[in-house]
């Protein structure tokens, strides 16, 4: 069940507005009640059902029991801390490592000011921001992979 409101094109004022491109978003299918009352609950319940179904069909393994008297050879953080862990591990001076991590958000703050002359929405027409994003992504993935390697291969990844 949906409600469809069609424009009254016999109205001269409405036709004049539409000719100028000043039409309202009042035509077609309204958000209330169609989307908010019917579509959104179906999507939300479907997502919850999929999550519960996947959790029941494939529960995650608990793993081996913790032994407080046996320490593993190398302790690794959670996967999302791999790049910062590797950065702190390969930079010999710890203060320099912390400052290098603090310089990342400080550098990102200055990107809009560097590129303030460019008013385009398309990211490929904003070369500085696009380059910073792509280089940052590659460096983060590189450091994340390097955290799982030995300290000798942490930067080169054993490739060269």
From Swiss-Prot:
InterPro entries: Cyt_b/b6_C (IPR005798), Cyt_b/b6_C_sf (IPR036150), Cyt_b6/f_cplx_suIV (IPR005870), Cytochrome_b_C_euk/bac (IPR048260). One of its GO terms (molecular function) is electron transporter, transferring electrons within cytochrome b6/f complex of photosystem II activity. Keywords: Chloroplast, Electron transport, Membrane, Photosynthesis, Plastid, Thylakoid, Transmembrane, Transmembrane helix, Transport. It is found in: Plastid, Chloroplast thylakoid membrane. SUPFAM superfamilies: a domain/subunit of cytochrome bc1 complex (Ubiquinol-cytochrome c reductase) (SSF81648). It holds the Pfam family Cytochrom_B_C. One of its GO terms (cellular component) is chloroplast thylakoid membrane. One of its GO terms (biological process) is photosynthetic electron transport chain. Gene3D superfamilies: plastocyanin oxidoreductase (1.10.287.980), Single helix bin (1.20.5.510). The chain crosses the membrane at residues 36-56, 95-115, 127-147. It is a multi-pass membrane protein. Component of the cytochrome b6-f complex, which mediates electron transfer between photosystem II (PSII) and photosystem I (PSI), cyclic electron flow around PSI, and state transitions. The 4 large subunits of the cytochrome b6-f complex are cytochrome b6, subunit IV (17 kDa polypeptide, petD), cytochrome f and the Rieske protein, while the 4 small subunits are petG, petL, petM and petN. The complex functions as a dimer. Belongs to the cytochrome b family. PetD subfamily. This is Cytochrome b6-f complex subunit 4. The gene is petD.
């Amino acid at each position: 069940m949906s409600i469809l409101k069609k424009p009254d094109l016999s109205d001269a004022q409405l036709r004049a507005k539409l000719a100028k491109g000043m039409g309202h978003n009042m035509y077609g299918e309204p958000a209330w009640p169609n989307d908010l009352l019917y579509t959104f609950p179906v999507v939300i319940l479907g997502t919850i059902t999929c999550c519960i179904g996947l959790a029941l069909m494939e529960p995650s393994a608990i793993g081996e029991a913790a032994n407080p008297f046996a320490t593993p050879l190398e302790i690794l953080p959670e996967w999302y801390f791999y790049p910062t862990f590797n950065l702190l591990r390969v930079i010999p001076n710890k203060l320099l490592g912390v400052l290098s991590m603090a310089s990342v958000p400080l550098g990102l703050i200055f990107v809009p000011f560097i590129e303030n002359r460019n008013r385009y929405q398309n990211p490929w027409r904003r070369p500085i921001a696009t380059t910073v994003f792509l280089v940052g992504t590659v460096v983060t993935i590189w450091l994340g992979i390097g955290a799982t390697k030995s300290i000798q291969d942490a930067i080169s990844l054993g490739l060269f």
